[in-house]
């Protein structure tokens, strides 16, 4: 029996629940035929046959419903290859036959492509609705559908909180995580936009006063870095040649261009943000908030200046916080590219060398992975219990290259088993050595300049680049007979997150924030539930990090950003002196305030003030975002008083520590309140192969390319616009040819949003596949064609009723209203619980499987053959179901729902836009559970008959029977007989119901619905070789027995109960399906055996 029977056999093991049938799959993309429609997939006008999406990496989420990878892929491939060879032979044989045997078919001419759509609506006015007869609107056309609506929404003020219905149901406020002005948006931004806008639109339709504040982040390091690269690429200049003022002017130009691009993209994606309240992290109010926070924290002693060890990026010439450093693990000797070096640099090697003991011929051997740092060594540590070195404790080793003695000290930190058991100490260039240096009062000697070259303290190596010295130091040690050996060593290499330069721990004067007190407060509000973080894994990570929080280095050696409001006091006679630990500093919101503070503090002394040239860490100012965009530090600002604290922050889990925790800390410290009460962390998007998206790999996808579509050649061209190296462009081009051989088809914003939400399950990372996106574009076309059909069946004078009178409704009408009510409840529950994937599943199932594939199909017979009263009733039901369906979908798919809703006849009380229409709510009077259960039983019968007709190729004049063995089942099936006949398809012309005592006809294939009902289809006349058919079914029965045995063994295995509930349910369903199929095979064999008698 073919695969179609397997699919429909799901129903035989599940009593009367249609919901269970359809919900066993998540969203099927690409979609097989519907459970309810004809076995062949119905392709609506404008649809193409979907291509199967490949299985993605197991570590990440695939598209919901995407086919799981098969275990016998190799066997399947071999079969496919064999079939292809056979087909080729057949084609060759046909080619040799005389041409006269059949006239060649003329090739169908391709429909000429439509010219780009030009909308006639005046800018900002309500869209001029075109007829469905218009070439651009006969089928779903994203560019035509999405035109003009956003400009009207914005101009009409629908994005403002003031647009809500009165009285409001409450407030719902989201501060948009501000995108960096470093370039175009990517799919991660599109995901965030889609999730946040879905919630904003949902709450707005529910009557809430909603506010979604947009804006951009200046992104200090990232933006300065990208502009510096551009400057070098275009003019072969470095920023120092321009000077600070001209360079920052250049960055402001960049910001202006890309800020506008970002805003345009946010609008095209449908984000209903209040643009009248747009913010930028370096605008006037956010700058004031940043200065206020720095000064208050400094005055409280929480910000201090200290010469401490920091993570230093020599390529960007700036300090970094620990969160801005990533690690690369290597297992042994590895050559790596390092910015600023023509040749690869050696890592993963442990270099052994000896120090001479002062006044002795004896030596002590040490080992290091960074031999160049030995120029900064100021001590040697050994374990106090290591007998090899007991006699050397308290003595000194002599440095071979500089005039320096290194004391030999004992410390339990030293591992006797690692290396030689003796550890060289470089307190100024290693975080562990820094602590040992403090414990043993060692000298802290910095050997590096800010650019990574060696300074005067490096003796004869002065001026060399740090990794050049890695080799020259070993060469000189070898000449002196002090080099011992090299050996492979696994290690973790710290890298700058932005530049990928190897980080150097270095002693510099920086500004720091004491984090202990604020960290404890931020941890407490989460533990007390004042801030809810989801998913749970993000909560655990948040708590773990805050439990061991370190002080935060907030100064960055940059020109782009908020210049630190701190001023060094330079007293008369001390001009030209470098900063030292005795230097005096004052802070002020303005220079005038700083001057006044200094005059009060140093009364009678002459001085000048010199502002710190450094900028604040971007995350310091971004940490004030939720309150500063609403007017803080002006606590009397109306927006701040009304909308702070905000309701929710939606963001990626990867910036939970960078940003989220710091917003909570700073808000609690500055305002005494949490900045938001809910944090939802979405997954990270990877490519279809599970790789992190990177410009150098070419797998970063611009959301606008998805919305508008783009040719492959244009994708290649975009790679040349950025700062990629030639080899990176080549690698990216190669990937694009593989991933997008035909470019990216136009999908539209609605399909993109729906797809991204369908991926969002709150689990692991997302494997993004453009083919899945294109498949959901077909769902948009289904919505379009179904709406077009319904509107075409409503008379010109149709008047929708405010409330439906369901007393005389037919069972199919009650069924669709019941299913609609279930969908309404499911959508509201899913969005309330932030279960976005579930929401898309509910919406898809109702619109596609239930409204389109069942009720619309069922309605055709009534509309053509029913009484006037029945027709009017069905028209009202169709209208009501479509209206509710569009409103259900609107938060996720704003453009197509507005376009179609505007075409619906208006009922009393309707407003101007679907945006402000009430979101559907559960209605108890539309609960028809009994009628729905009866109707679903009829659907299963129709499905079973269709399946059998497809299996035995019955295309016309089919005779089907439904055997009911109880009085109740007989009555139910009989009552649904008209609907069953309608849904059986064109191949079946006759359906009869048989009672318990009536004799079964001979020569029938059998399909078991449940213990009480069986459907049969006469196939005797269509089977030429009954023995062959029996043999075929017997073979399938044997395979089914093996499947049942395998599933039973799996379910009874120890530990199976520990796997996820979803996996357990899936495996149990496989067993139920196989058992149902077995019963069908057995009954069919019985019937076919009778044909032989």
Swiss-Prot record:
Any one GO CC term of the record: mitochondrion
Q: Does the keyword Disulfide bond apply?
A: no
Identify which top EC class this enzyme belongs to.
Answer: ligase
- Out of the domains of life, which is the source? Eukaryota
User: Motif 'KMSKS' region: where?
Assistant: 692-696
Stated role: May have a second function in addition to protein synthesis.
Please list the residue ranges that the record marks as compositionally biased, kind Low complexity. 45-69, 85-103
Q: What is this protein called?
A: Valine--tRNA ligase, mitochondrial
Region Disordered: start-end pairs: 40-125
The UniProt entry, under SUPFAM superfamilies, shows: Anticodon-binding domain of a subclass of class I aminoacyl-tRNA synthetases, Nucleotidylyl transferase, ValRS/IleRS/LeuRS editing domain
Extract the coiled-coil ranges from the record. none
Query: What family classification does the UniProt entry report for this protein?
Result: Belongs to the class-I aminoacyl-tRNA synthetase family.
Q: EC number(s) of the enzyme?
A: 6.1.1.9
Which gene does this sequence derive from? cyt-20
Q: Give UniProt keywords alphabetically.
A: Aminoacyl-tRNA synthetase, ATP-binding, Cytoplasm, Ligase, Mitochondrion, Nucleotide-binding, Protein biosynthesis, Transit peptide
UniProt subcellular location: Mitochondrion; Cytoplasm
Q: Does the keyword Signal apply?
A: no
Binding annotation for ATP: 695
């Amino acid at each position: 029996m073919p695969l179609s029977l397997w699919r429909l056999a799901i129903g035989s093991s599940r009593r009367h629940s249609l919901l269970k049938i359809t919900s066993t799959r998540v969203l099927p993309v690409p979609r097989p035929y519907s459970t309810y429609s004809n076995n062949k997939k119905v392709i609506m006008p404008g649809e193409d046959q979907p291509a199967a999406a490949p299985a993605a990496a197991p570590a990440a989420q695939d598209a919901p419903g995407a086919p799981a990878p098969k275990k016998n892929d190799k066997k399947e491939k071999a079969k496919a290859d064999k079939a292809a060879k056979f087909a080729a032979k057949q084609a060759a044989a046909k080619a040799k036959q005389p041409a006269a045997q059949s006239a060649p078919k003329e090739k169908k001419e391709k429909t000429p492509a439509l010219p780009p759509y030009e909308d006639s609506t005046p800018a900002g006015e309500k869209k001029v609705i075109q007829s469905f007869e218009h070439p651009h609107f006969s089928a779903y056309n994203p560019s035509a559908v999405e035109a003009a609506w956003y400009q009207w929404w914005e101009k009409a003020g629908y994005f403002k909180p003031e647009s809500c219905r009165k009285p409001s149901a409450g407030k719902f406020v989201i501060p948009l995580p501000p995108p960096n002005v470093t370039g175009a948006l990517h799919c991660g931004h599109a995901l965030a936009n889609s999730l946040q806008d879905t919630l904003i639109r949902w709450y707005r339709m529910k009557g809430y006063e909603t506010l979604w504040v947009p804006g951009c982040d200046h992104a200090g390091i990232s933006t300065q870095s990208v502009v510096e690269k551009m400057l070098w690429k275009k003019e072969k200049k470095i920023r120092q040649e321009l000077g600070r003022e001209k360079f920052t002017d250049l960055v402001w130009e960049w910001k202006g261009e890309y800020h506008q691009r970002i805003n345009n993209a946010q609008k095209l994606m449908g984000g209903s943000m209040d643009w009248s309240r747009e913010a930028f992290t370096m605008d006037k109010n956010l700058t004031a908030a940043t200065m206020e926070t720095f000064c208050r924290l400094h005055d409280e002693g929480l910000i201090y200046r200290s010469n401490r060890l920091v993570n230093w990026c020599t390529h960007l010439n700036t300090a970094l916080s620990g969160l801005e450093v990533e690690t690369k693990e290597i297992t042994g000797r590895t050559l790596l590219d390092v910015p600023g070096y023509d040749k690869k640099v050696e890592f993963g090697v442990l270099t052994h060398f000896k120090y001479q003991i002062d006044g002795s011929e004896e030596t002590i051997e040490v080992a290091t992975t960074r031999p160049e740092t030995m120029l900064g060594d100021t001590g040697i540590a050994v374990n106090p219990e290591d007998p090899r070195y007991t006699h050397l404790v308290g003595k000194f080793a002599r440095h071979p290259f500089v005039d320096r003695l290194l004391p030999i000290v004992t410390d339990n930190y030293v591992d006797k088993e690692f290396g030689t058991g003796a550890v060289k100490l470089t307190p100024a260039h290693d975080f562990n050595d820094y602590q040992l240096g403090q414990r043993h009062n060692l000298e802290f000697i910095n050997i590096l300049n800010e650019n990574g070259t060696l300074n005067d303290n490096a003796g004869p190596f002065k001026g060399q680049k740090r990794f050049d010295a890695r080799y020259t130091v070993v060469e000189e040690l070898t000449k002196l007979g002090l080099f011992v050996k090299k050996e492979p060593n696994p290690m973790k290499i710290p890298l700058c997150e932005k530049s990928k330069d190897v980080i150097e721990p270095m002693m510099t004067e920086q500004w720091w924030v004491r984090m202990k007190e604020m960290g404890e407060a931020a941890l407490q509000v989460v533990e007390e539930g004042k801030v809810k973080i989801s998913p749970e894994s993000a909560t655990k990570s948040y708590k773990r990090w805050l439990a061991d929080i370190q002080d935060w280095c907030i100064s960055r050696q940059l020109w782009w950003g908020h210049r630190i409001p701190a001023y060094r006091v330079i007293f008369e006679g001390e001009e030209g002196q470098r900063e030292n630990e005795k230097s005096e500093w004052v802070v002020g919101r303005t220079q005038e305030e700083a001057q006044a503070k200094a005059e009060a503090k140093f009364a009678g002394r002459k001085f000048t003030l010199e502002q710190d040239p450094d900028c604040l860490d971007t995350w310091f100012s971004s940490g004030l975002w939720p309150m500063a965009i609403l007017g803080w530090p002006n606590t009397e600002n109306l927006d701040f008083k009304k909308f702070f604290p905000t309701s929710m922050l939606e963001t990626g889990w990867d910036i939970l520590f960078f940003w989220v925790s710091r917003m909570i800390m700073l808000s609690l410290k500055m305002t005494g309140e949490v900045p938001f009460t809910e944090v939802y962390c979405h997954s990270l998007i990877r490519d279809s192969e599970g790789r992190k998206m990177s410009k150098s790999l070419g797998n970063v996808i611009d959301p606008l390319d998805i919305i508008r579509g783009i040719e492959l050649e244009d994708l290649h061209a975009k790679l040349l616009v950025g700062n990629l190296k030639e080899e990176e462009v080549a690698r990216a081009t190669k990937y694009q040819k593989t991933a997008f051989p035909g470019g990216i088809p136009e999908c539209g914003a609605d399909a993109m949003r729906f797809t991204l939400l369908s991926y969002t399950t709150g689990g692991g990372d997302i494997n993004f596949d453009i083919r899945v996106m294109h498949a959901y574009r077909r769902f948009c076309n289904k919505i379009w064609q179904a709406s077009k059909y319904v509107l075409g069946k409503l008379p010109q004078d149709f008047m929708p009723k405010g409330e439906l009178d369901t007393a005389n409704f037919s069972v199919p009408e009650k069924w669709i209203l019941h299913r609609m009510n279930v969908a309404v409840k499911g959508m509201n529950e899913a969005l309330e619980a932030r279960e976005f994937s579930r929401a898309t599943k509910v919406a898809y199932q109702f619109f596609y499987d239930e409204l389109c594939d069942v009720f619309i199909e069922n309605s055709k017979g009534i509309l053509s053959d029913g009484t006037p009263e029945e027709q009017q009733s069905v028209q009202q039901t169709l209208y009501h179901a479509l209206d509710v369906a569009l409103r259900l979908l609107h938060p996720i798919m704003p453009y197509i729902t507005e376009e179609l809703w505007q075409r619906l006849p208006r009922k009393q009380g309707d407003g101007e836009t679907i945006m402000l229409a009430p979101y559907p709510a559960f209605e108890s009077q539309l609960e028809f559970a009994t009628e729905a259960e009866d109707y679903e039983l009829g659907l299963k019968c129709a499905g079973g008959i269709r399946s059998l007709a497809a299996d035995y190729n019955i295309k016309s004049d089919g005779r089907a029977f439904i055997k009911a063995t109880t009085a109740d089942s007989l009555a139910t099936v009989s009552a649904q007989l008209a609907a069953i006949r309608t849904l059986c398809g064109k191949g079946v012309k006759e359906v009869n119901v048989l009672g318990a005592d009536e004799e079964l006809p001979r020569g029938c294939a059998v399909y078991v619905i449940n213990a009480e009902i069986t459907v049969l289809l006469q196939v005797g006349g269509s089977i030429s070789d009954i023995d062959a058919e029996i043999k075929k079914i017997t073979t399938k029965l044997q395979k089914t027995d093996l499947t049942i045995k395998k599933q039973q063994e799996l379910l009874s295995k120890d530990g199976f109960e520990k796997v996820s509930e979803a996996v357990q349910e899936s495996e149990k369903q496989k067993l139920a399906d196989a058992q149902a199929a077995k019963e069908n095979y057995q009954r069919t064999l019985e019937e076919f055996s009778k044909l032989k008698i």
